[in-house]
Amino acid sequence: ILFISVPSVFAQKIEKETVPGQEPTLVERLTGGKKVIESAEMNFQLFTSANANFIGSDFDGMNFKLNRVRLEIKGNVWKNLSYHYRQSFNKYSDPYSLDNLSSSLELAYVNLKVHDKFGFTIGKQFVNFGGYEYFVNSIKVREFSEFNNLLTCYQAGISGNWQINPDHELCFQIVNNRSGQDNEIYPTGLPDNTREAKVPFMYTVNWNSYYFDRILQLRYAASVGQQTQKRYSYYFTCGNTIEKGPLLTYLDIMYTRQGLDQH
């Protein structure tokens, strides 16, 4: 198994005066009429393997496989405005009807820091579930648990972060509960006694905390989303991690209850 992450970092500050007569952008308004690029970073992530297949004890063949290939671009436009874009080359779908994005586009958001302790994230982003396996960079995970493998990890929406202190963070998030219409999610159709939700949102409260010089790390979250009228999905996800030097162990506890089975 081969894992490669190639970062290409470009960090500098570039300033340009606004062209006379041109409508100023949001960034120019925030920075007093200047275009500022604080930093930019591009990462290429590759996870490949050689696979040998057996049927019982009989050798059935061998092949090389690119399990995950991703391109990531992120950085700071201004000291309080950052961006993050990530695309996967292992999956593709036509743009979904709700968010108008293909599943290959995993992340596309901007983060605005309005105070040292408060910030907002707008765009397609991580759904703020708890758990170590869910939070860690997926390029490092060989095989996801069945629960995480079926979760919809990225959705369009908005979230707010409150950094209570260096060891405690509280996040509030509202995102789409799904990317497409009901007929794309439930191929057999909805039950006769329910109708399509007019506001198919998922609401999440996420608490992240660190203890004992960050040796103990907790990532807990509670989520509720409307699937259809009078049908809801509930998630309670807990991540408990101990990390000290080369030692890392974790216990993820995850529970879901759904009014309609999506999986």
Please annotate each region the language model reported:
Residues 1-22:
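Cleavable N-terminal export/targeting peptides
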Residues 21, 54-56:
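Short strand-turn segments of transmembrane beta-barrel domains in outer membranes
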Residues 21-25, 30:
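N-terminal regions that are enriched for targeting/export leaders
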Residues 29-52, 59-180, 208-212:
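Outer membrane beta-barrel
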